[in-house]
Amino acid sequence: MQADYVIVGSGSAGSAIAYRLSEDGRYSVIVIEAGGSDFGPFIQMPAALAWPMSMKRYNWGYLSEPEPNLDNRRITAPRGKVIGGSSSINGLVYVRGHAEDFNRWEELGAQGWAYADVLPYFKRMEHSHGGEEGWRGTDGPLHVQRGPVSNPLFHAFIQAGAQAGFELTDDYNGSKQEGFGLMEQTIHNGRRWSAANAYLKPALKRGNVTLVNGFARKVIIENGRAVGVEIERRGRVETVKANREVIVSASSFNSPKLLMLSGIGPAAHLKDMGIEVKADRPGVGANLQDHMEFYFQQVSTKPVSLYSWLPWFWQGVAGAQWLLSKGGLGASNQFEACAFLRSAPGLKQPDIQYHFLPVAISYDGKAAAKSHGFQAHVGYNLSKSRGNVTLRSADPHDDPVIRFNYMSHPEDWEKFRHCVRLTREIFGQKAFDDFRGPEIQPGENIETDEQIDAFLREHLESAYHPCGTCRMGDRNDPMAVVDPECRVIGVEGLRVADSSIFPHVTYGNLNGPSIMTGEKAADHILGKTPLPRSNQEPWVNPRAAVSDR
């Protein structure tokens, strides 16, 4: 089995790469995916988003090592094991990131990945329904929409932000990210619009793309060049030969794992695992970053939340309505309002993100209280804490060792304490007077720094945005794994393109920038001149130097 290009992983970036490499019909492409079909309502119905993330059938099901700053809890670290990868099991939220994120990438050595460079790729990939004119793409593969925003709690949240003195934004993926506004979703005609639906399935219809269901064991390297991928399929070990290049797009956990199993990584660690060193790249597995969040929950004194729909019977009614019409509550992820805020004066960009939900539920999907309620998922998104991914053994079937080192930087604690107090201020605004009941979580008695810290240690969870473990940078940077054209330094014919190459975590959910990475990487692989740089200047808050709002 062979093709011009072999891609490991059918996720956000891998699907986009397959689509672009196969576009003109010149090249053959094989996409290797360990997971199975994405068919069925658990994945395709937006409101069912909590299900695939908790199902072993669709998810690698990783756990972190005990996190010392979080009461030694092992934190859930899901990654998609299904066609479409994590874009098939995520929360369907679409955020490009802030302009400063990508300018920071370039400062860290990713030349050609500044905001002016990547904005044209965001436009190329988007089919935006209702975004800011001139800033959004309108004919790309990825449909992006807003929800119906029919619940009054969404409007109360946005009004509360304005009453607290914060900015409003008509399109946070346009010129102005900062402020309260409506959240965008990767949903089209009532269905999840994953990378599989947007990119991979259309590419498979061309006849020069083949999807292979198999488990990648290692990249085969001969004389310093990647020549194929060793996989397990139907109980046998096989080789998939790459006539031109191998592209690894296997996630921020599995991309470094596969490189290390192939002999690319920190030499001392590889030797400890009994793996022959092909390229000593100490940055493989290092620089792990993520977003954390907690749920701030409040009782609603009016019966307007989604609490009535939580019993199994009514969930079944919503599911049946979606199956028949692709409409109703099932056609939205229910994240329809949001905010992007700065925690302090002097910041160039927002660093706190809110997802607002018109129901109070726990991580397992059960009601947080026996009453109507609402909640905000609150996260500080520019943490300085760093972790790593290493091998557990040389056995490809062993899970990687994931150490996030969450909350290991003192600033993280300061910022998250601020998040708790800021959310109380927002929920305390006049707009919520008709809805606000008792505080469920953290609880009205949680006030001091010590009490808030104890709450955070017990309740902080991952927002499932890992990145950075195969960092992109200058070829002379010893910690860089790939150069700005996504080529693995020290090995010919091998690239990595997914969220693992991000030099720094972006501000927001990672599906959007991961797809953009695949789009831009495809041009590099094909040797195309990058799209012309944009000269559009994003909005800058004129009060940023003196105010946090």
Curated annotation (Swiss-Prot):
Q: What class of enzyme is it?
A: oxidoreductase
Region ranges (Disordered): 528-549
Which Pfam families is this protein grouped with? Answer: GMC_oxred_C, GMC_oxred_N
Asked whether the keyword Flavoprotein is assigned, the reply is yes
- Give the SUPFAM superfamilies listed for this entry: FAD-linked reductases, C-terminal domain, FAD/NAD(P)-binding domain
Q: Which family does it belong to?
A: Belongs to the GMC oxidoreductase family.
Q: What is this protein called?
A: Oxygen-dependent choline dehydrogenase
Q: Which organism is it from?
A: Agrobacterium fabrum (strain C58 / ATCC 33970) (Agrobacterium tumefaciens (strain C58))
Which lineage?
Bacteria, Pseudomonadati, Pseudomonadota, Alphaproteobacteria, Hyphomicrobiales
